[in-house]
Each structure stands twice: as C-alpha cells, then as structure tokens.
Amino acid sequence: MKGLAFCTAILFLVGSLPGQEAPSPADVARYGQYPADYKEIIMKWLDTQLVDAPSARIEWTSEPKATDYEKNGEHFYGYLVTFTVNARNRFGTYTGKQRHGAVIKNGEVIKGLGLGY
C-alpha cells in the first residue's frame, strides 16, 4: 500500500514539472519561430559586424529565450541569445572576451547587444 502511494506521489510530481511547451500561435506571431539554428544565424550576422570574423572565438552562454527587449522606447520582440566574442581587431590583436547578445526573429538578427550598439 505504501509503495502504491509512493508511486502515485512520484507520478504526480513528475507530471507537474514545467516542460518545454509548444509556443502558442500568439507567441509565434510576436516572437517568431524558435531559432533552432541560432548559432548559424548569429555567425552569419557576425561576419558582417566584425573586422576579422574568421578569427572570432565564440562561447555560447545561453540558449534562445523569448524576450521583449526595449531600448529608447522601441521594443524588439524575438529570442535573445547571449555569448562572448574574442576576435582580432584592426591591429591584428585579440580583444579579449567581450559579452554580447543578439535578438533573433524569423531567422535573422533584428538587434545586436554590445558591438557598439
């Protein structure tokens, strides 16, 4: 009897754990599709932002998270990804790790954080 009560309690607790729910249509309309290929999207964007993009050493510090990023009264809805970049500058020396982020919506970066933004 105790074993049955224990198993029932465990099933109840496991069933109530928060899981990765499918985004609602309203969320997709606001934030866009979840960027499963976020690393490729950001690397392509960094190619246009860095002086020596091939030298970039990237460390990903977060998975994409739905966000409402606001700056100067303007809202950017999408998925925020944070990362560090260590790349060569115009003088050919590495800059050291610097924290950056990007807001992705529908497969493209709509707002960069860091990199002079």
Model-predicted segments: where are they?
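Sec-dependent N-terminal signal peptides
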Residues: 4-14
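Cystatin/cathelin-like cysteine-protease inhibitor module
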Residues: 20-117
